[in-house]
Structure formats: structure tokens, C-alpha cells
């Protein structure tokens, strides 16, 4: 297959975005990654994002500071006065929601896409993320429309920017199984919202990751 288009992948350092990165390598010509430091308690994930970008051999890895998200109160990911919950995600936006986070992240990635003339932005949102308003299909399609309406590259009639969301209809286990097929080094990923080393194993993110990997590698002895 002749790879023509490029992509910039939102890379947190976690399992889902790592699989997205490895998948993107099979589809796109040049792959860029972008990660964000926004006052998250689990900022250690950025070290994993750096390592994953190096292993994947990306064209360039950008790390962007988004300090104002730390000023927002009410999210357990950034507010030191709130505990990271251990229960599974509820049917409504959980306390780990950072308002407008993915919209902000996509907008910043779109700025890089405009400058570097990158036609695709990859984000690893999936079905288990549905309680988060900015992890749904309607969000992705709306964000794509706004980005294209704002793009200098599009205004110059060079290319449109597409939001690449291949995991929307997939479960965490589906993503892990795809990652296994692609040879993703899961041991180089980090998915604990508490930011501890080793991971706490108690928060919803840790437990969902563990369950997905257990189901994926149930036929092995390791």
C-alpha cells in the first residue's frame, strides 16, 4: 500500500494511544506525536510517551504545556483536593473529567497540523470512554468541522484535516488485542491516574487496563 498522508497522534503514554500510534505507522507515511503537560497527577506518563515515540521512530514528538487546565477545579486528575476514585466509570461524566480537554488538545494538534501540513489527527477515544462528553463520535465529527473551518491549510485549498478515530466502536480488550497483533510494547506504557510507581492497581484506569491485557494474553503463560 502506498502511504501518502501524514498524521499527528495524541499520545498520552497509555495503552490506547500507544496502539493508535502503532496502527498509524501501518497506515500513514510520516507519523508525528503530541503530548500534553497540563498539571495532571500522572505526569509521569510523559516519560512513557517520550520512550514510545522513540521506539516507534516518529518524525517528531511535541510536548506542549497547557498550564491553565491545572487552574480548573473539580477534576480529580488535576485538583489536589480531590481523590482519584477506585470505582468504575459511572453513566455520567466522572469526577476525572477535565472540561474541554480533548477539544483543547485537538485544537493545539490542529495548529501543528496546519504548520506542518499534516492531513490527519489521531485520537484513541473508544466505547468505554463514552461517559466523557469529549470522547464520543458526535464530538469528533463536530471538532473536525470546526478545525477545518479554522484551518489555514484548508483555506488555501491544500488539504482537509481529518480526525482519525479508529477505536470508537471498540472495547478496551479489542484495542489490546489489536495492539498485540501490531507488536505494541505494552510494558512501555503507563495508565495509572494516581501517578504512582508502580501503578496503584486500584483506580478504574489501572483495573480496566489489567482486565484488557489479561483477556488479551490469556493464552500465554506470561
Swiss-Prot record:
Entry's Gene Ontology BP terms: queuosine biosynthetic process
Annotated residues for binding of Zn(2+): 192, 200, 203, 206
Enzyme kind, highest EC tier: ligase
Keyword Nucleotide-binding carried by entry: yes
UniProt KW keywords: ATP-binding, Ligase, Metal-binding, Nucleotide-binding, Queuosine biosynthesis, Zinc
EC number(s) from the headed UniProt entry: 6.3.4.20
Chemical reaction(s) catalysed: 7-carboxy-7-deazaguanine + NH4(+) + ATP = 7-cyano-7-deazaguanine + ADP + phosphate + H2O + H(+)
Needed co-factor(s): Zn(2+)
Domain of life: Bacteria
Annotated Pfam families: QueC
Cofactor, free-text remark: Binds 1 zinc ion per subunit.
Residues that, per the record, bind ATP: 11-21
SUPFAM superfamilies, per the entry: Adenine nucleotide alpha hydrolases-like
Keyword Metal-binding listed: yes
Purpose: Catalyzes the ATP-dependent conversion of 7-carboxy-7-deazaguanine (CDG) to 7-cyano-7-deazaguanine (preQ(0)).
Similarity remark: Belongs to the QueC family.
Official protein name in the record: 7-cyano-7-deazaguanine synthase
Organism: Sulfurihydrogenibium sp. (strain YO3AOP1)
Amino acid at each position: 500500500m502506498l502511504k501518502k498522508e501524514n498524521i499527528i497522534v495524541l499520545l498520552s503514554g497509555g495503552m490506547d494511544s500507544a496502539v493508535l500510534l502503532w496502527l498509524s505507522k501501518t497506515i500513514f507515511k510520516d507519523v508525528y506525536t503530541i503530548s500534553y503537560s497540563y498539571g495532571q497527577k500522572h505526569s509521569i506518563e510523559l516519560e512513557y510517551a517520550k520512550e514510545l515515540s522513540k521506539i516507534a521512530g516518529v518524525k517528531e514528538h511535541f510536548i506542549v504545556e497547557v498550564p491553565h487546565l491545572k487552574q480548573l477545579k473539580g477534576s480529580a486528575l488535576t485538583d489536589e483536593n480531590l481523590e482519584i476514585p477506585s470505582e468504575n466509570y459511572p453513566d455520567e461524566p466522572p469526577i476525572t473529567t477535565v472540561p474541554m480537554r480533548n477539544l483543547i488538545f485537538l485544537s493545539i494538534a490542529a495548529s501543528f497540523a496546519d504548520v506542518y501540513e499534516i492531513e490527519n489527527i489521531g485520537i484513541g477515544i473508544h466505547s468505554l470512554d463514552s461517559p466523557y462528553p469529549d470522547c464520543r463520535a458526535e464530538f469528533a465529527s463536530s471538532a473536525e468541522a470546526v478545525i477545518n473551518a479554522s484551518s489555514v491549510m484548508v483555506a488555501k485549498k491544500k488539504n482537509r484535516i481529518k480526525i482519525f478515530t479508529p477505536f470508537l466502536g471498540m472495547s478496551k480488550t479489542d484495542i489490546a488485542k489489536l495492539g498485540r497483533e501490531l507488536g505494541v510494547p505494552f510494558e512501555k506504557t503507563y495508565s495509572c491516574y494516581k501517578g504512582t510507581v508502580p501503578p496503584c492497581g486500584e483506580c478504574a484506569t489501572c483495573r480496566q487496563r489489567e482486565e484488557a491485557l489479561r483477556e488479551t494474553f490469556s493464552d500465554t503463560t506470561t
